[in-house]
């Protein structure tokens, strides 16, 4: 199995000490980051968008500062960048019959991208684990 594509919720939990799953995500990352971890345009953009949103935290970063935090993390020697190199229909082919709502399409794309790279999607989202895709999802709970 290849690298872990980190869902935005994992990236945020790792970077934000006040996040409820910061410690849990940190322990998981310490065990698995040596296997390689990846981001993509979707997860990177979500990271900057959420960390710079005042609704997320009264201590939200500016977009420029959120971008600096992201860039600092991407300098890790075990980080891989996965471009959004597959189409949406190709990415969703393994789960399209299991999707129940419009809010699942990005998660399904991320899962398809991870599978395309022979990796796993690491997430805090329990709903993704219910899609029945076996070992392609690493649920951090």
Feature-to-residue mapping (PLM):
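Short, conserved alpha-helical segments within structured domains
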Residues: 39-44, 106
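Alpha-helix capping/helix-boundary segments
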Residues: 10, 43, 87-88, 127-128
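Active-site neighborhoods of divalent-metal-dependent phosphate/nucleic-acid chemistry enzymes
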Residues: 60, 76-122
């Amino acid at each position: 199995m290849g690298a872990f594509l980190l869902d935005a919720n994992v990236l945020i939990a790792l970077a934000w000490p006040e996040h409820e799953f910061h410690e849990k995500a940190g322990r998981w990352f310490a065990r698995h980051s040596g296997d390689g971890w990846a981001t993509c345009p979707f997860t990177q953009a979500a990271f900057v968008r959420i960390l710079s949103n005042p609704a997320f935290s009264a201590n939200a970063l500016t977009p420029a500062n959120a971008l600096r935090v992201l860039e600092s993390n991407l300098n890790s020697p075990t980080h891989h960048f996965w471009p959004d190199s597959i189409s949406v229909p190709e990415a969703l082919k393994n789960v399209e019959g299991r999707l129940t709502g419009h809010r699942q399409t990005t998660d399904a794309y991320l899962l398809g991208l991870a599978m395309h790279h022979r990796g796993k999607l690491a997430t805090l989202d329990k709903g993704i684990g219910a899609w029945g895709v076996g070992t392609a999802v690493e649920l951090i709970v």
